[in-house]
């Protein structure tokens, strides 16, 4: 019997912190996390939004597209622009996942969708759920 590949979730937005405090090692770890999420959850669409103090670029991936990240940035840090980008582009994500070191104090108002902060630091975000990842 032929197999049918289904999508599991709706649209996911992934904010990637590309500020100056994020190095190549962290970006590689973030890329691995995004690829694992795409393989496991099979969302309908993934928007990867690169942000330092402003949104620098974004990429959109479909459910079966290979994930190849092209990060842009290197300045200061502000988390608000990713959330503003979601609203400005009329995207209704099932969740927003932010990959960051949490070295920032500029948080947006709490959105209506769930937010997961994925970090390699011991800091905690003021809303949503904070998950710590460690290097393998």
Where are the language model's segments positioned?
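Generic recognition of flexible, low-complexity loop/linker segments
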Residues: 1-3, 34-37, 83-86, 104-105
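Acidic, polar low-complexity linker/tail segments
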Residues: 1-13, 25
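Residues at the starts of beta-strands that form the adenosine-phosphate
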Residues: 11, 45-47, 95, 114
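Redox- and metal-dependent alpha/beta enzyme cores, enriched for Fe-S-associated oxidoreductases
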Residues: 18-28, 32-67
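Extracytoplasmic/secreted cell-surface and envelope-processing proteins
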Residues: 23, 106-109
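Von Willebrand factor
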Residues: 47, 51-106, 119-121, 132-136
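Short, structured coil segments at secondary-structure junctions
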Residues: 111-113, 126
């Amino acid at each position: 019997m032929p197999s049918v590949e289904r999508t599991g979730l709706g649209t996911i937005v992934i904010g990637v912190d590309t500020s100056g405090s994020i190095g190549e090692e962290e970006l590689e770890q973030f890329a691995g996390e995004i690829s694992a999420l795409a393989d496991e959850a099979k969302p309908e669409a993934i928007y990867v939004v690169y942000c330092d103090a402003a949104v620098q670029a974004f990429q959109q991936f479909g459910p079966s597209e290979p994930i190849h990240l092209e990060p842009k940035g290197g300045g200061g840090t502000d988390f608000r622009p990713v959330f503003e980008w979601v609203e400005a582009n009329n995207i209704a994500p099932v969740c927003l996942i932010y990959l960051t070191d949490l070295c920032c104090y500029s948080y947006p108002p709490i959105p209506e969708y769930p937010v997961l902060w994925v970090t390699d630091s011991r800091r905690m975000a003021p809303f949503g759920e904070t998950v710590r990842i460690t290097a393998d």
